[in-house]
Amino acid sequence: MLRTMLKSKIHRATVTCADLHYVGSVTIDADLMDAADLLEGEQVTIVDIDNGARLVTYAITGERGSGVIGINGAAAHLVHPGDLVILIAYATMDDARARTYQPRIVFVDAYNKPIDMGHDPAFVPENAGELLDPRLGVG
């Protein structure tokens, strides 16, 4: 039996730009792609925390260190700059691997810089209060 499991999650990233006229995808800072073990072209689900929108697209590599989370193409109708999003990737694996697999969970600050990384999808960092809306700390 094969199971589809959580592979990677970038938690509560801030959308930095949206380009309706781009061909599609989500642009993700190369540092975040590395931290979350995402490859260019990999399928990702975007969950918009602000409005509840959910969509599936693919990742493209953004400038390293830029903090970019760019929503491209038709998805720009659903997700807007400043929105908080969760980026999720799944992997299909056999039952034995699924029982031992540890996903990559990346928490980011208001500038989309990794501040906590782990493997437990239920883990909440000590500074979770600040992560509830990292935009409050910007400025």
From Swiss-Prot:
A Gene Ontology term for the protein's cellular component: cytosol
Pathway: Cofactor biosynthesis; (R)-pantothenate biosynthesis; beta-alanine from L-aspartate: step 1/1
A GO term for molecular function: aspartate 1-decarboxylase activity
Superkingdom to which the source organism belongs: Bacteria
PTM sites of type Pyruvic acid (Ser): 25
Biotechnological applications listed in the UniProt record: Subcutaneous immunization with the double panD and panC bacterial disruption mutant protects mice for over a year against subsequent virulent M.tuberculosis (strain Erdman) infections; mice show mild lung inflammation and fibrosis despite a chronic bacterila infection. This is a promising attenuated vaccine strain.
Database matches in SUPFAM superfamilies: ADC-like
InterPro entries the record matches: Asp_de-COase-like_dom_sf, Asp_decarbox
PTMs per UniProt: Is synthesized initially as an inactive proenzyme, which is activated by self-cleavage at a specific serine bond to produce a beta-subunit with a hydroxyl group at its C-terminus and an alpha-subunit with a pyruvoyl group at its N-terminus. Cleavage is not necessary for tetramerization upon expression in E.coli; protein expressed in E.coli is fully process in vitro after 48 hours at 37 degrees Celsius.
Reaction equations catalysed: L-aspartate + H(+) = beta-alanine + CO2
Subcellular location per the Swiss-Prot or TrEMBL entry: Cytoplasm
The UniProt record lists the keyword Iron-sulfur: no
Protein name as catalogued: Aspartate 1-decarboxylase
